[in-house]
Amino acid sequence: MKRGPSHERHMRRRDFLTWMGMGLAGATGASSRCQTRNGDETAGLPGRDTASSFTPDVEIALTAAPSAVQILPGALTQVWAYSGSVVKGPPSTIQSLAGSYLGPIIRLQTGQKVRVHFANQLPEHTTVHWHGLHVPERMDGHPRFIIPNGQSYVYEFEVINRAGTYWYHPHHHDRTGPQVYNGLAGLLLVSDPKEAALGLPSGAQEIVCVLQDRTFDADNQLVYGSGMPMESMNGFLGDRVLVNGQTQPSLSLATRAYRLRLLNGSNSRVYKLAWGDGTPVTVIGTDGGLLEQLLRRPYLTLAPGERADVILDLSQHRVGTSLQLRSLAFPSAPFEMGMGMGRGMRRGIGRMGGTGRQTSAANGAPFSILTIRVQRRETSNVELPATLSTFDASWHREQTEQSVRRLTVQFGRMQWLLNGRTFEMDDVAANETVSLDAKEVWEFDNSGAAMMGMRLAHPLHLHGRQFRVLDRQVDPRFAKDGDSLREGFTDEGWKDTVLVMPGERVQILVHFTRYTGMFLYHCHNLEHEDMGMMRNYRVVARAG
């Protein structure tokens, strides 16, 4: 099959093993194709036909196809892009981002039943994952339900999530990184009556910001990777940051309050977001919606896949002034391979490609993200309530039914592993099976890899569930790895992705409600995910 529009010099795991001189015999743990156990890539397409019992409130047509957009002056950039239209429901359900390769914003309401007619017009297979939404097994975009190029799939689900900032992207195993990089991503915003009653900034006062880093060649085409073997182990990094698919973005705003919906849509880059004038960052929401009370942070740490809702109050700014949203510098050590294998390859300003030009900036390099220009005077009466939302009081450790389920981050066979295992399409281990309606404490343990010298942070994502972060414990020997980012964590909110630093053990509380079936948990560093740092977990009905 033809690959993507970017110049892909990125090493896949099999290539990396060969480079390391280990041969293909060590590659038995990962599959390079998305097949079901019987080897039929088109098997498991139940979404081709609509369910007769499902009556949608909203119906959408969504297509993934090659396209070309103006990102830089000169030649158009070849991308892959989602496009959409409303078949049934409010016209406002689909909102395109003009001049962007990003998919349309999909606006839904809690309680709506949604049908999405998805058409794959790409030159390769794909799926659509509704990141953060609680949906049935066959509707979650698992690579078992791969959609071959030229074919279609019907996704049907009820929106049972609370209001919040979610998103959608592909989930083709070992191709998620390049497919997202080539442009396949979009925001999905859910509203509900409780949030609407708060009177938060909306309409023109609601601003979406999807942060992604990219590298372009001299002809304005995307470059995915440098071909360096450590890149697969560390994750892809570009040499510039785009907001909503645009370079050097700026906004002309007024002296009033705005709501910024932020998504880190990068493959592996972590952002340390702060206002240029030192004003604290006011956070009102995380992955799964509004916090109970707002948080004020000196900066906001946003790992790949994470979202945050931020209030920007410009009421005290003078007309004619400007404000920068920046990503501050932080040490790159927790995001680079150790053991002498490439450590320092990306230290400092970045890494040089085969042509001698800089192809990336290190994780932790400072960036100017967005320039805000205050150009007019307006008054607004937005007052944030003391209580933004109320969380279920039963979400406490004491409500869990069993001991902690420990899930370890490990490095072996020249790849990142979860519990010593790599991804297998249909495989679920005994300790990856949970009971429907169970409340469990899961512990993501990243201490062992750190002890081995593999001191990398991992943003770990759980499909189909929102969770609460209960606790972080860090080995004092590795505490400095996270010190420069720790004040920006937003563990107080509902999460589906959490950054686990080297030497750290993070405990989360999860309630496995509503749907049985097989779902994924994985690292949301997309290169790690594609190399096999992903596993299934299965939710089963209780006996009797």
PLM region spans:
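Active-site pocket scaffolds in enzymes
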Residues: 73-78, 130-132, 138-143, 147, ...
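Beta-strand-rich extracellular modules
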Residues: 171-173, 328-330, 447, 524-526
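Histidine-centered copper-binding motifs that mark active-site loops
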Residues: 3-10, 19-23, 34-313, 333, ...
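Short, surface-exposed loop/turn segments at beta-strand-coil junctions that are enriched for proline
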Residues: 158-162, 313-319, 512-516
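Exposed beta-strand face motif in extracellular beta-rich ectodomains
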Residues: 164-166, 321-323, 519
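Hydrophobic h-region of N-terminal signal peptides that target proteins for export
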Residues: 25-30
